[in-house]
Amino acid sequence: MKGRSALLRALWIAALSFGLGGVAVAAEPTAKAAPYENLMVPSPSMGRDIPVAFLAGGPHAVYLLDAFNAGPDVSNWVTAGNAMNTLAGKGISVVAPAGGAYSMYTNWEQDGSKQWDTFLSAELPDWLAANRGLAPGGHAAVGAAQGGYGAMALAAFHPDRFGFAGSMSGFLYPSNTTTNGAIAAGMQQFGGVDTNGMWGAPQLGRWKWHDPWVHASLLAQNNTRVWVWSPTNPGASDPAAMIGQAAEAMGNSRMFYNQYRSVGGHNGHFDFPASGDNGWGSWAPQLGAMSGDIVGAIR
């Protein structure tokens, strides 16, 4: 595996030196961040181009998924999360899509403009493979709040693409009765979104189809590396990022831990500290804390 990864890195560097092109639009990075590109990646499923911040670093990448109040043009991981500086020089690429606010990064049954699972698991990795020389699979997905859910779901349902999942303050048991009610109420309050358009009404049962807790055995069977962080403190410096439901995420993360262990999972790091913010004051340094694990899993 290490030999294959070394070969991929060598081929990626060689390809990059010949200037792989694409239809992306490059923009100037912010002054304090490591140099990165602002790409516009086409999404046929959503019928529009999606803004993606991209930091070249190797053939395997970490995909960073925002909290509920995701930035429309630049990922909050780039701005509040300082992700480009944190991950620069580590031998991996960084992929941070914007525009996924109040979406759960899933495919909505009744909203064609929200087909995030298709974009993140197929359209985006295929585009990056063709236009930036990345490997088609073997990546990591990391996210906060709704992004924590999205990261775990991508790894569970698309193991050919993602071999690492990191969740911070994530909603990892959405089909739980208390949780689906909290998500529905919070997304309506903060985003004006009706979640019946996502997976239908919770009582119809389709929320379970998309639930990492229900499908934790897939993560265990594939030996996917998982990292879960959620503080005992239910406070959130930015309530909109957590749709006012930080306590629900805390409970979800612990229930997910118990389920993961019960189905034989043994490749996880779980941290439930007494202190910490369900917000960027903790999520940004937590990305640094897990960066060694990410690199070890995908580089």
UniProtKB/Swiss-Prot annotation:
Transmembrane segments: none
SUPFAM superfamilies from the UniProt entry: alpha/beta-Hydrolases
Signal peptide (residue range): 1-26
Pfam families linked: Esterase
Any one Gene Ontology molecular-function term assigned to this protein's record: acyltransferase activity, transferring groups other than amino-acyl groups
Subcellular localization(s) per the UniProt record: Secreted
Principal subcellular localisation of the protein: secreted
Subunit structure: Homodimer.
Name listed for the protein in its UniProt record: MPT51/MPB51 antigen
Organism: Mycobacterium tuberculosis (strain ATCC 25618 / H37Rv)
